[in-house]
Amino acid sequence: MPHSQCKNNHEKLSSEISIWAAGRIVIMADYDEYCWIGENGEGTELDLEFPDWPEIRELHYAFLTWLCKMTSRRPGDDGRIHDFDWVAFHKEGIFLCKRLKSVLKESVDVCYMKPFEDPQSDGAGLIRID
């Protein structure tokens, strides 16, 4: 195996271990990120964590399209977005999470969380995706 390929495999494995060690991926729309990992919830993007996975790259772009539906809206003075179809937004977000879980299988927990901008999100916890 050429050194460069060996190095790429090592980098891929290191990347995967970093997110697996975190044990959980939380998908939550925010203005800068959609994916949060680790105990401290550091923001990241799936294609950065899994650069050599075509299925993840496809999901990354699907999550960005989903995220833009919310971030293109202007929040009110209270920081919430009131004129928005949150039911459809969450349905799509959970659907994408299920696709992500089907790719990652049992390697990590995938969870969904409603963003602060949803007026109905008060006290809403994590939804674990099975």
Regions picked out by a protein language model, each given a short descriptive name:
Residues M1-D130:
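Intrinsic low-complexity, intrinsically disordered or marginally ordered coil/linker segments
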